[in-house]
């Protein structure tokens, strides 16, 4: 139970980076926070998959749910990075605009999600996933 709580706290800390301003021109004027990610139903489904994977006792299946969930969240963060400006500023895909108006907090969010995935992979490699048991 302690491990599951610790894994949940690590995941919530990683998700808390969505509260930061990811995109925008001038600070405080045109900021778009990472909560824009929650407008994407795939990202919400990936968050739910990760939480289900943490709190179930299915060994390999739990690992796969967490892995798919965290990878999906990272992919949706990159998708938002590439497309956030289409509806708000430019009206078309522009990679240069994505890089120019991206705040460092976005990169912090992506790196924290990668770190979370690496922590989970390290933990699951240390245990025997062939057993369907509680991993606490």
What does each model-found stretch correspond to?
Residues 1-136:
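Compact integral membrane and secretory-pathway proteins
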């Amino acid at each position: 139970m302690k491990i599951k709580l610790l894994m949940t706290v690590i995941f919530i800390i990683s998700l808390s980076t969505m509260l930061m301003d990811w995109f925008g021109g001038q600070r405080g004027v045109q900021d778009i926070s990472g909560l824009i990610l929650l407008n994407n139903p795939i990202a919400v489904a990936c968050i739910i998959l990760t939480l289900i994977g943490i709190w179930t006792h299915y060994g390999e299946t739990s690992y796969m749910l967490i892995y798919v969930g965290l990878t999906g969240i990272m992919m949706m963060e990159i998708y938002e990075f590439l497309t956030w400006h289409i509806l708000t500023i430019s009206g078309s895909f522009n990679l240069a605009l994505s890089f120019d108006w991206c705040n460092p907090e976005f990169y912090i969010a992506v790196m924290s999600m990668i770190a979370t995935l690496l922590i989970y992979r390290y933990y699951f490699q240390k245990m025997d996933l062939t057993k369907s048991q509680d991993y606490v």
